[in-house]
């Protein structure tokens, strides 16, 4: 049980400190990709929503 708690704490701390990457800038050559990079963290949520839509389409069998 303690190991699971430690793992959760490590993940939570890394998520907090990884927010510093949000202020990082892309190199000038890739500046045109900024809008795509801003949306990329949300993409996994689209797959989660797709799963619910798919299950609704098949009547939650």
UniProtKB/Swiss-Prot annotation:
Subcellular location: Plastid, Chloroplast thylakoid membrane
Residue numbers covered by the propeptide annotation in the UniProt entry: 1-24
Membrane topology summary: Single-pass membrane protein
UniProt keyword Thylakoid present: yes
Cellular component GO terms, alphabetical: chloroplast thylakoid membrane; photosystem II reaction center
Chain segments annotated as transmembrane: 40-60
Coiled coil start-end: none
Domain of life, per lineage: Eukaryota
Alphabetical keyword list: Chloroplast, Membrane, Photosynthesis, Photosystem II, Plastid, Reaction center, Thylakoid, Transmembrane, Transmembrane helix
Main location class: plastid
InterPro entries xref list: PSII_PsbK (IPR003687), PSII_PsbK_sf (IPR037270)
Biological function: One of the components of the core complex of photosystem II (PSII). PSII is a light-driven water:plastoquinone oxidoreductase that uses light energy to abstract electrons from H(2)O, generating O(2) and a proton gradient subsequently used for ATP formation. It consists of a core antenna complex that captures photons, and an electron transfer chain that converts photonic excitation into a charge separation.
Subunit structure, interactors included: PSII is composed of 1 copy each of membrane proteins PsbA, PsbB, PsbC, PsbD, PsbE, PsbF, PsbH, PsbI, PsbJ, PsbK, PsbL, PsbM, PsbT, PsbX, PsbY, PsbZ, Psb30/Ycf12, at least 3 peripheral proteins of the oxygen-evolving complex and a large number of cofactors. It forms dimeric complexes.
PANTHER family linked to this entry: PHOTOSYSTEM II REACTION CENTER PROTEIN K, PTHR35325
Sequence similarity: Belongs to the PsbK family.
Protein name: Photosystem II reaction center protein K
Organism, scientific name: Sinapis alba (White mustard)
Organism taxonomic ancestry: Eukaryota, Viridiplantae, Streptophyta, Embryophyta, Tracheophyta
Recorded name of the encoding gene: psbK
